[in-house]
Each structure stands twice: as structure tokens, then as C-alpha cells.
Amino acid sequence: MKRKDIIRKLAEAGFVFEEGGNHTKAYKDGIYRTTIGRHTEIPERIVMKIEKQTGVKLR
């Protein structure tokens, strides 16, 4: 799955982002939820972990 699609879906769900050196941190209600690596394509197993950590269906 493309990184920009993950960011877009999380933003629609109310997440805000903080850019780091190699990752983007996702927060909701001021609480840190997950980290998204700076890769064009995110592996399926990582997408599943992001879904579990955020509670947002991405696929």
C-alpha cells in the first residue's frame, strides 16, 4: 500500500502528524499511536500493524 494513501486515510479519521527524520508519527487526541516509515510502498505486514495500532481500516 502506498504511504500517501495510509496518511490520507488516517487524516480522514482525525489523526495529526509530526514529521521526523525518517518517519512520520501519527497522533490522535494528543496521544501517540503509530509511526509510518518513509517508503513509497509500505509492506502488507506493516499495514496490518498500523491498522491494529490505530484502529482504522486501511485496506
Where are these regions (language model features)?
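Basic nucleic-acid-binding interfaces
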Residues: 1-20, 28-59
